[in-house]
């Protein structure tokens, strides 16, 4: 992904992490609470099989839609 889109996407990831703060369900492996920013990044990596930085520019809108889905469906 080019630098401009990568920065835009990181800003969207941070905003999603802010939004999800305190909304993720409790998990026994995270007694102090879950990291919502890491959650978004890990979900992106899991779905697209690569870091958000390495995803092709052509999938930018698809990644943004997926982040919106994550915000609506905290898990």
Residue ranges and their predicted role:
Residues 1-75:
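Positively charged, phosphate-engaging catalytic surfaces used for nucleic-acid and nucleotide handling
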């Amino acid at each position: 992904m080019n630098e401009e889109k990568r920065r835009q996407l990181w800003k969207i990831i941070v905003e999603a992490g802010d939004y999800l703060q305190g909304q993720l369900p409790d998990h026994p492996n995270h007694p102090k609470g879950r990291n919502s920013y890491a959650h978004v990044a890990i979900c992106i990596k899991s779905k697209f099989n690569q870091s958000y930085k390495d995803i092709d520019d052509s999938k930018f809108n698809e990644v943004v839609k997926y982040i919106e889905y994550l915000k609506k469906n905290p898990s």
